[in-house]
C-alpha cells in the first residue's frame, strides 16, 4: 500500500509495545520512507500531543511526562489542570484505567476535535493506519481510532485476536 500513497502521505503501522514495533521493523527489513512504525504512545506524542498541545491548552510551564503515583488522577479535568498549571502530563489511576479510560488518548482526541490544524495535519499526512494487537485497545483508544476513520477519513486496517488479549481488564 505504501506505493499507492501521494508523495506527501504516509502509512503508519502502530502497535502496543516497543518489542512488537521492533518485530515489525525486522520483518519489513527495507522500510520505505513513507512508512512510520511506532507504538501507540509514541505515535500520539509525536504526531498529535507534542506538536498541538499548546494550541489547544494554555501551558504555564514546559511539558513533562510522569508516571509517578503521586500525579495520577481519576478525572479528565484534573489531568488537564495538572498539564496547564504544572506542565505534568500524567495518567489515570488504576481504577479509572480499568474502566477503559486512557488519558493520553482522550487528550489526543480532544486536540483533534478542537484544533483544526491538528486534524488537518493528520488527515493529510496519513492515508492509512495499520493497528496491530487491537484486542488490547481500551475504550479511549477505540474512540480515538474510530474518530480518525469517521471524521478524518483515514483508512484503518485493524489486526487483533481476542484469544491473545493481555489487557482484558481495560474494558
Where are these regions (language model features)?
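Conserved helicase motor core of SF1/SF2 NTP-dependent helicases
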Residues: 1, 138-171
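P-loop NTPase Walker
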Residues: 1-53
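Short His-Asn-centered micro-motif
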Residues: 14-16, 133, 159-160
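Short, glycine/acidic-enriched loop or turn micro-motifs at the edges of active sites
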Residues: 42, 135, 164
Amino acid at each position: 500500500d505504501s506505493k499507492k500513497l501521494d508523495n506527501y502521505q504516509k502509512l503508519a503501522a502502530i502497535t502496543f509495545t516497543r518489542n512488537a514495533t521492533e518485530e515489525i521493523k525486522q520483518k519489513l527489513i527495507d522500510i520505505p520512507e513513507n512508512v512510520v512504525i511506532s507504538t501507540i504512545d509514541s505515535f500520539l506524542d509525536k504526531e498529535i500531543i507534542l506538536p498541538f498541545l499548546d494550541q489547544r491548552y494554555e501551558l504555564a510551564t514546559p511539558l513533562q511526562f510522569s508516571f509517578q503515583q503521586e500525579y495520577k488522577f481519576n478525572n479528565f479535568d484534573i489531568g488537564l489542570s495538572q498539564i496547564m498549571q504544572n506542565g505534568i502530563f500524567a495518567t489515570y489511576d488504576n481504577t479509572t484505567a480499568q474502566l477503559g479510560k486512557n488519558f493520553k488518548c482522550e487528550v489526543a482526541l480532544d486536540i483533534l476535535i478542537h484544533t483544526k490544524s491538528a486534524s488537518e495535519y493528520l488527515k493529510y499526512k496519513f492515508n492509512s493506519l495499520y493497528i496491530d494487537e487491537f484486542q488490547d485497545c481500551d475504550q479511549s483508544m477505540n474512540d480515538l481510532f474510530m474518530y480518525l476513520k469517521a471524521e478524518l477519513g483515514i483508512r484503518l486496517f485493524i489486526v487483533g485476536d481476542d484469544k491473545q488479549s493481555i489487557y482484558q481488564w481495560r474494558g
